[in-house]
Amino acid sequence: MPAYHSSLMDPDTKLIGNMALLPLRSQFKGPAPRETKDTDIVDEAIYYFKANVFFKNYEIKNEADRTLIYITLYISECLKKLQKCNSKSQGEKEMYTLGITNFPIPGEPGFPLNAIYAKPASKQEDEMMRAYLQQLRQETGLRLCEKVFDPQSDKPSKWWTCFVKRQFMNKSLSGPGQ
């Protein structure tokens, strides 16, 4: 079974480094254009997460795949936090905190995927990439809470938390031991 790839890459999609700046249906401020379709890259990443997380190798077919990879790795980080939460409201607070926490971007020493991501070419591109990744993180965390928490019990679903120990591409956005 092959890995799932993003279908959202258009020829006129703007790039930051070698990552696609894709439109989002987001309530958070950031450089991403507004998405008018029903599905955006965050929906796609959440939908494909359970299948893609099993892959140790992932062939990048376009720049949107790099965005998909980042969100997939971020979902893994989110699940580590969400499994410890007792309620959806606690989970939303954790996701907000994780979303705005200082994080490395491509080209910086702590970023785990510097081999496949180009670092920003200028200070302006650096700021735009950081803002876009933060917008992705915030939106992903919020939407993931909607999927992970069971509305009846207000507890994290075991069908999501069972993926906590899985590492997509044998990588993690957090450092070793975190």
Curated annotation (Swiss-Prot):
Cellular localisation = Cytoplasm, Cytoskeleton; Cell projection; Nucleus
Record-annotated membrane-spanning stretches: none
**A Pfam family assignment:** P21-Arc
Q: Which residues carry this modification: Phosphotyrosine?
A: Y47
Q: Does the UniProt entry include the keyword Phosphoprotein? A: yes
Q: Where do we see the Glycyl lysine isopeptide (Lys-Gly) (interchain with G-Cter in SUMO2) cross-link in this protein? A: K14
What does the entry give for GO biological process? Arp2/3 complex-mediated actin nucleation; regulation of actin filament polymerization; regulation of synaptic vesicle endocytosis
- Modified positions (N6-acetyllysine) are K56, K61
Gene Ontology terms for molecular function: actin filament binding; structural constituent of cytoskeleton
Q: Which UniProt keywords apply?
A: Acetylation, Actin-binding, Cell projection, Cytoplasm, Cytoskeleton, Isopeptide bond, Nucleus, Phosphoprotein, Ubl conjugation
Which PANTHER family does the protein's record reference? ARP2/3 COMPLEX 21 KD SUBUNIT
What does this protein do, in the record's words?
Component of the Arp2/3 complex, a multiprotein complex that mediates actin polymerization upon stimulation by nucleation-promoting factor (NPF). The Arp2/3 complex mediates the formation of branched actin networks in the cytoplasm, providing the force for cell motility. In addition to its role in the cytoplasmic cytoskeleton, the Arp2/3 complex also promotes actin polymerization in the nucleus, thereby regulating gene transcription and repair of damaged DNA.
Listed name of the protein: Actin-related protein 2/3 complex subunit 3
Q: Which organism is it from?
A: Mus musculus
Gene name as annotated = Arpc3
